[in-house]
Amino acid sequence: MTTTTEARALPRLKQRYRDEIKGQLHEQFSYGNVMQIPGLTKVVVNMGVGEAARDSKLIDGAVRDLTAITGQKPQITKARKSIAQFKLREGMPIGCHTTLRGDRMWEFLDRLLSLALPRIRDFRGLSPKQFDGNGNYTFGLNEQSMFHEIDQDKIDRVRGMDITVVTTATTDDEGRALLRALGFPFKEN
């Protein structure tokens, strides 16, 4: 009994990382071991919806948008503590986030770099200073309409999002070199 399994196509960015970028980084930083070459671990996309404390239906729009953008259902973030000034109670939904790993992560980054970021009006590049000291990079987008998965007519309100790219790099310079090689458009100082 033989079964034929179709090999899924490798994401374009992952193929480029394996074929070209790993070799470039190995030469640039002259690692002694191939396991020291920095790679991507995960991408976390977070959408905070502070207004959901007053109107709990707003979280549904954020979940719908994030599902369309990332291709997987996000987890709803709930308030840890009650804060009277914000009329916030413990356990109220205040946002949603999703963690992308594997092929979904590579496909999301490919869409982000080749389709979404070029659609931003007056885009001058990402800030190269937003690394955390360990090679991880976080940046914010102030509207979801730049993703082509979102139907412009069905947007109920403009929502921003935070995107964190977690790498195995140990320093900011290694992380910056990895992300620049992947095609992240950093501003030149």
Curated annotation (Swiss-Prot):
CC terms in the record's Gene Ontology section: ribonucleoprotein complex; ribosome
Gene symbol of the encoding locus: rplE
Subunit structure of this chain's protein: Part of the 50S ribosomal subunit; part of the 5S rRNA/L5/L18/L25 subcomplex. Contacts the 5S rRNA and the P site tRNA. Forms a bridge to the 30S subunit in the 70S ribosome.
Protein name: Large ribosomal subunit protein uL5
Matching Pfam families: Ribosomal_L5, Ribosomal_L5_C
Organism: Kineococcus radiotolerans (strain ATCC BAA-149 / DSM 14245 / SRS30216)
Organism ancestry: Bacteria, Bacillati, Actinomycetota, Actinomycetes, Kineosporiales
Keywords in alphabetical order: Ribonucleoprotein, Ribosomal protein, RNA-binding, rRNA-binding, tRNA-binding
Molecular function as annotated in GO: rRNA binding; structural constituent of ribosome; tRNA binding
Domain of life from the UniProt record: Bacteria
Protein's job: This is one of the proteins that bind and probably mediate the attachment of the 5S RNA into the large ribosomal subunit, where it forms part of the central protuberance. In the 70S ribosome it contacts protein S13 of the 30S subunit (bridge B1b), connecting the 2 subunits; this bridge is implicated in subunit movement. Contacts the P site tRNA; the 5S rRNA and some of its associated proteins might help stabilize positioning of ribosome-bound tRNAs.
